[in-house]
């Protein structure tokens, strides 16, 4: 199997994950806010919350509009509660 992408953030639906980013971030833009919510906290920490299944990204900009971070977010269900239905 492929090695996990270190730039991809995996989070479960209705769960939150803390991610440390470089300082100087002024603005966060989320590709699809129906899939994930990204909230900037003090100290360059963002809270990534899974809202719907799928993949999106977020871009962090500094005050001049320069892109500091562009990361993929994968929102999935908890694998320990996965049910397979055979028809």
Model-derived features: positions:
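Sec-dependent N-terminal signal peptides of Gram-negative outer-membrane/periplasmic proteins
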Residues: 1-87
């Amino acid at each position: 199997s492929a090695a996990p992408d270190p730039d991809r953030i995996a989070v479960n639906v209705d769960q939150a994950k803390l991610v440390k980013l470089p300082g100087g971030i002024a603005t966060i833009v989320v590709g699809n806010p129906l899939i994930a919510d990204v909230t900037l906290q003090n100290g360059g920490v963002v809270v990534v919350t899974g809202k719907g299944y799928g993949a999106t990204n977020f871009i962090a900009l500094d005050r001049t509009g320069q892109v500091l971070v562009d990361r993929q977010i994968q929102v999935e269900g908890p694998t320990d509660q996965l049910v397979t239905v055979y028809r």
